[in-house]
C-alpha cells in the first residue's frame, strides 16, 4: 500500500491553535503600542501649538483673543509666524480643542483622547486611560497620560 503525503487533521489543528495563541498575545500589545504612539503625537502637537501661543503672547502681551472652539479658530493669530502648519486633529483624528477668553489672559488646548468626548472633569495630574482628555493650560500639561494605559 502506498502512503499518501500531506498533513493530518490533528497536525493542522495544532498549527492553527498555535497561531491563535500567538495572535491573542500579539494583537493587544500592538493595539496598545498604536494608541501610545497616538498619545505621544497628540502631546507633541499640543506642545507645538502652546509654544506658538506663548510666542504670540511675547510679541503682543496677551494670548489670542478668541473664545472656545476648535484649534483652527486661532490659526490666523499664529500661522505662519509662530507655527508653520496648525495641526487640526489629534492622533485619533478628533479635532484639537481650544478654550480661551476674549481678554487674552488665559488659554487651554486639549484633546478628547481616544474616547472622542469630553471628560466630565479634569484632574490635575496623570491619567491611565487612553480615553481621558489630554489638557495643556497656560504653560504646562494639566492632565496627561502616564504609565500603563487601559482601554
List where the protein language model places each region:
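N-terminal single-pass transmembrane signal-anchor helix
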Residues: 2-31
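Short acidic linear motifs
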Residues: 9, 17, 48-51, 55-56, ...
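Acidic active-site catalytic centers that drive phospho-/nucleotidyl reactions
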Residues: 11, 45, 90
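Aliphatic-rich helix starts adjacent to a transmembrane/signal segment
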Residues: 29-46
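Short, solvent-exposed loop/turn and secondary-structure capping segments
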Residues: 42, 59, 120-122
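Extracellular/periplasmic head regions of type IV pilus-like filament subunits
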Residues: 51-54, 58-108
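Short, surface-exposed interaction loops/tails
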Residues: 102-151
Amino acid at each position: 500500500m502506498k502512503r499518501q503525503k500531506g498533513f493530518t487533521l490533528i497536525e493542522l489543528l495544532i498549527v492553527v491553535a498555535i497561531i491563535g495563541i500567538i495572535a491573542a498575545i500579539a494583537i493587544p500589545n500592538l493595539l496598545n503600542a498604536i494608541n501610545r504612539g497616538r498619545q505621544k503625537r497628540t502631546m507633541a502637537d499640543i506642545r507645538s501649538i502652546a509654544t506658538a501661543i506663548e510666542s504670540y503672547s511675547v510679541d503682543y502681551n496677551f494670548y489670542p483673543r478668541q473664545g472656545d472652539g476648535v484649534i483652527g479658530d486661532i490659526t490666523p493669530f499664529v500661522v505662519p509666524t509662530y507655527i508653520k502648519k496648525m495641526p487640526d486633529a489629534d492622533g485619533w483624528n478628533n479635532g484639537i480643542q481650544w478654550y480661551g477668553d476674549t481678554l487674552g489672559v488665559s488659554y487651554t488646548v486639549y484633546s478628547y483622547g481616544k474616547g472622542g468626548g469630553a471628560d466630565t472633569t479634569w484632574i490635575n495630574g496623570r491619567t491611565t486611560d487612553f480615553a481621558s482628555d489630554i489638557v495643556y493650560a497656560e504653560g504646562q500639561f494639566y492632565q496627561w497620560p502616564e504609565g500603563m494605559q487601559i482601554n
